[in-house]
C-alpha cells in the first residue's frame, strides 16, 4: 500500500517517505 502521512514530526523530520513536516503532523508533499 501507499505510505500514510500522519505521524507526529519532531525537529521537522518525517520518517514516512514522501511526507513533509507540517508541525505537528506529517503531510503528503
UniProtKB/Swiss-Prot annotation:
Which Gene Ontology biological process is one annotated for this entry? killing of cells of another organism
In the record, the note on similarity to other proteins reads:
Belongs to the cyclotide family. Moebuis subfamily.
Q: Where is this cross-link: Cyclopeptide (Gly-Asn)?
A: 1-29
> SUPFAM superfamilies recorded for this chain?
Cyclotides
Top-level taxon of the source organism = Eukaryota
The post-translation modification note in this UniProt entry reads: This is a cyclic peptide. Contains 3 disulfide bonds.
Q: What is this protein called?
A: Cyclotide mela-4
Biological source species: Melicytus latifolius
Sorted alphabetically, which keywords does the UniProt record give? Cytolysis, Disulfide bond, Knottin, Plant defense
User: Do you know which PROSITE patterns this protein is assigned to?
Assistant: CYCLOTIDE
Amino acid at each position: 500500500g501507499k505510505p500514510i502521512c500522519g505521524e507526529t514530526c519532531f525537529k521537522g523530520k518525517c520518517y514516512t517517505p514522501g511526507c513533509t513536516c507540517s508541525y505537528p503532523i506529517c503531510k503528503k508533499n
